[in-house]
Amino acid sequence: MGNIFGHLFRISTFGESHGGGVGVVIDGCPPQLEISAEEIQVELDRRRPGQSKITTPRKEADTCEIISGVFEGKTLGTPITILVRNQDTRPQDYDEMAQKYRPSHADATYDAKYGIRNWQGGGRSSARETIGRVAAGAIAKKILRQVANVEIIAYVKRIKDLEGVVDPNTVTLEQVESNIVRCPDAECGDRMIELIEQIGRQGDSIGGVVECVARNVPKGLGEPVFDKLEADIAKGVMSLPASKGFEIGSGFAGTLLTGIEHNDEFYIDQNDEIRTVTNRSGGIQGGISNGENIILRVAFKPTATIRKEQKTVTREGEETLLAAKGRHDPCVLPRAVPMVEAMVALVLCDHLLRHHGQCKVL
């Protein structure tokens, strides 16, 4: 249960961290979309482990295989299956964790729910599960670009107490990818890299905030009440491993303002379009996109699996100590950037198809 996401553009991910492989089945993709494994690989390469000195040293090529749903370079309208085979597995690193629970990880809760768990790398609770999301997100991004010229860019906004100065309205992908931490503020990015390296040498971890902007989103996406656009985006990004907080537009800072300070006043632009002077709503009003940039932020906690010794308990209920082995990110933020983009793309693509199906028929 809980392995399916979306309504019309639906995905189901599969696989475990140290099993044979991971992947995704995509249902509801429109036919005749030109797509290649190479295009999907670009996004997977941004997510893959071992890409820099501040990520996990696990070495995986994460080469994707399109198993079904694409013929002669075009989607068929049938389910698309994408598989990435695991190569650099070391299940023996987790032998101790077969009995000892990692603090703040899913080990104890999976056992409490199912009475059994894959303790080799966390199984489905591993961030390796997100490979399927990023692969599907690559296809969703292409649909959004082709239909509405939608552009989705995420970046590292903050690591611990180091916060970059970035304008989400003008930031470019080239700026994001200009350094290994994926912070467009180059000077702050250098300090972030130094901090992550320092924390990693100590066997510890740190968290931070990813900010994301979606530009050129058509007006009208989102459904009233329970399927509001920001609610579905929140569900998508909050389902990512290690995510602990979400805000959109002014977010929690908006609670410090009065109504006259917070309201986005309307005006008519040179193209006779209704626009807003400010964008504290973050591009969504009443759960429906208003045509302004959608701007959101996701908080990620420090990686739970660390080499520092911690108090814990065993499956048998005995108190003990654990200094975790294995290969893990000292900070998940640089690799979380394409994950956030993927989830936002999946939600927007799903709502685009739903909107066209309901409101563009007659």
From Swiss-Prot:
Source domain of life: Bacteria
GO cellular component, as recorded: cytosol
Annotated positions binding FMN: R124, S125, S126, G286, K301, P302, T303, A304, T305, R327
Gene3D superfamilies found in the cross-reference section: Chorismate synthase AroC
Cofactors: FMNH2
Pfam families, per the entry: Chorismate_synt (PF01264)
Subunit structure: Homotetramer.
Family listed: Belongs to the chorismate synthase family.
Name of the protein in its database record: Chorismate synthase
Organism this protein belongs to: Nostoc punctiforme (strain ATCC 29133 / PCC 73102)
